[in-house]
């Protein structure tokens, strides 16, 4: 018999798995005295789980776990299976056994069992759970079907806390419906911030249509759901603000000029950019639509002001211009040389242009004017190519 069944006030009995196996069970198997003999001996297979609350009670405090020693017996004298049946049901093992270690040494195993009402295989599962601890030195060894074990019995905890009936003012079915609606609404609110979709109003309308029948009619009577709807409306405004800022940034980068000339006036460009940025900052208190329009106008004006300069300072255009001038120079030189050879005319290419020197051959008036015009064109082309090449060298 147990010599001590009570603990002093203020003490609670909550041993760990290691303490149950290495101290209490080991001393029980070795028939050694336990200093505070607080765990009772119970024949688990002759008592129902609901009776354990009174039989294994410790002190006057409310308990959620009950501990006891039990001696395992075989189901059949010649068999190897353990008898786990009671008068009202049976205990069924579930899952794998858990190993219990102390300082990297195996000391025991823990088996989890669930109580079923009725007889197998048509038993009804209950909320009673039992952890059965046994001494073991080999994790892969054959478990002993006889001997002492220490058990912890408790009820399975519910997933959600149930309110007391006194806290409600209507029927239990209505309370369940209220909890379900609040849960579904919270799921909608919590999942919506992760979806940055442009057509958010359509998504919100789609959620309302997929909710169970009666939700829209119940919104006016549920203050929690109304508060969540206000939060969702506030979130919609935030999403619209972010989308407008995103479009504004895209327009800013799309409308920038492709290439800036190193010889352009940087001071004027900086002044224009500073003026445009200050205008955008001053219009921060205006509506988002006006900000978007002003931003587009400012950057479009900046782009068009630099359009003329860009056409003349673009390196690719300049390269094509130089190539065309060089090709024109070669053609003009070939024409002049051929004309001078045919007419026996000497061309003086000094400094300013061409001079036709007559060697006694009388040229027609039209031919001489044509030679002079061609010489002037060649001089102008040569001067333009020389200036453009100097700019490139700079």
From Swiss-Prot:
One Gene Ontology molecular-function label: DNA-binding transcription factor activity
Q: What tissues has this protein been observed in?
A: Detected in root vessels of protoxylems, outermost metaxylems, inner metaxylems, shoots and hypocotyls. Expressed in roots, hypocotyls, cotyledons and leaves. Expressed in developing xylems. Specifically expressed in vessels in the secondary xylem of the root-hypocotyl region, and in vessels but not in interfascicular fibers in stems.
Query: What PROSITE patterns does this protein map onto?
Result: NAC (PS51005)
Q: Which InterPro entries has this protein been placed in? A: NAC-dom, NAC_dom_sf
What biological processes does GO assign it? cell wall organization; positive regulation of secondary cell wall biogenesis; regulation of DNA-templated transcription; xylem vessel member cell differentiation
**Record has Transferase as a keyword:** no
DNA-binding region listed in the record: 107-162
Q: Name the domain of life this protein comes from.
A: Eukaryota
Tell whether Glycosyltransferase is among the UniProt keywords: no
Compartments it resides in: Nucleus
> Cross-referenced Pfam families, in alphabetical order?
NAM
Might you report a single GO cellular component term?
Answer: nucleus
Q: Which residues form the signal peptide?
A: none
Q: Which residues form the NAC domain?
A: 7-156
Q: What is its main location?
A: nucleus
Q: Which UniProt keywords apply?
A: Activator, Cell wall biogenesis/degradation, Developmental protein, DNA-binding, Nucleus, Transcription, Transcription regulation
PANTHER family from the entry?
Answer: NAC DOMAIN-CONTAINING PROTEIN, PROTEIN CUP-SHAPED COTYLEDON 2-RELATED
Protein family according to the UniProt entry: Belongs to the plant vascular related NAC-domain protein family.
Tell me, in a sentence or two, what this protein's role is.
Answer: Transcription activator that binds to the secondary wall NAC binding element (SNBE), 5'-(T/A)NN(C/T)(T/C/G)TNNNNNNNA(A/C)GN(A/C/T)(A/T)-3', in the promoter of target genes. Involved in xylem formation by promoting the expression of secondary wall-associated transcription factors and of genes involved in secondary wall biosynthesis and programmed cell death, genes driven by the secondary wall NAC binding element (SNBE). Triggers thickening of secondary walls.
Domain notes per entry = The NAC domain includes a DNA binding domain and a dimerization domain.
Q: How does it assemble?
A: Interacts with NAC083/VNI2.
State the name under which the record lists this protein.
NAC domain-containing protein 26
- This chain's source organism reads Arabidopsis thaliana (Mouse-ear cress)
